[in-house]
């Protein structure tokens, strides 16, 4: 089946330090193993505005990492038994990359790598609502929230913390609790669900606003501490001085210091950071030999070096293998309704709403929800 594809498209690109909607952008070329989708829904992430503000993305490059749509063209080496024109898929794209600046999620057409793509067995449609509560992943608005957040969460638990991909085992895989700082973030909500379903830890402790407590406990969180409390770290340490597994889902200088203080006093502890924060970012007087900081970089799953600002991220074949294995494992669970998308706020003016979405994320107007633009 052939689908008519235009020569150019509308996309959101970096121009003069801003996200700008432009016409006449060339359709991205397809590398080996990629497919072209007609983009139907996209979601914003903090990394999108960071690529602009921190000058990570090149001028003119297409922004966006979360895309969902319908396949219109198969690239080289794509098995038509696995992916066909007309299939509905969703996946992670490194938008505004130095290596592939002509491809990003925030465009009418996007190229997605099939080895790290999620696939829906059914036709996906728009629900048409302004707001969606957390629920089964069965709409275009819902699937657009999944790729970055869920894939990151899966890698944190399996690649960084070493959990096995076992669904609802009878006993916890680790003998201690896990602390998730930023439990209501998109990655945090995914982590709670996965940590619960994989029975990874004896307890799932989250730090988030009290207003999110009901939902986070529905996902599987055991206990919530409110980050608004001035003594939140002291509260946690008073009750739990043995936390060996910690994830900083907010990932800034302040939260790193707080999470670090929550780590176990004596036994070895691992903190997973979602940004490039290391021991060097911890105040010298607080550093301890028993605490290790590990970093998860979703950009490393592409199978090649990634120029990223003033550094180059090395190719990480093990992270790539872990991502492929996780997606293959979790995709049927999503299709069965065993993983829920987080609450969604929908923007209905297509790509024209993307600059607004990025500002809303940058200034913290997305508490506990994912911001999605639909392209009708």
UniProtKB/Swiss-Prot annotation:
Q: Which SMART domains match?
A: PKS_ER
Highest taxon, organism lineage: Eukaryota
Q: Which GO terms describe its molecular function?
A: oxidoreductase activity, acting on NAD(P)H
Entries under CDD domains matching the protein: enoyl_reductase_like
PANTHER family per the record? Answer: HYPOTHETICAL OXIDOREDUCTASE (EUROFUNG), ZINC-TYPE ALCOHOL DEHYDROGENASE-LIKE PROTEIN C2E1P3.01
Something else the entry says is: Present with 799 molecules/cell in log phase SD medium.
Q: Which family does it belong to?
A: Belongs to the YCR102c/YLR460c/YNL134c family.
Protein name in UniProt: Uncharacterized protein YLR460C
Taxonomic source organism: Saccharomyces cerevisiae (strain ATCC 204508 / S288c) (Baker's yeast)
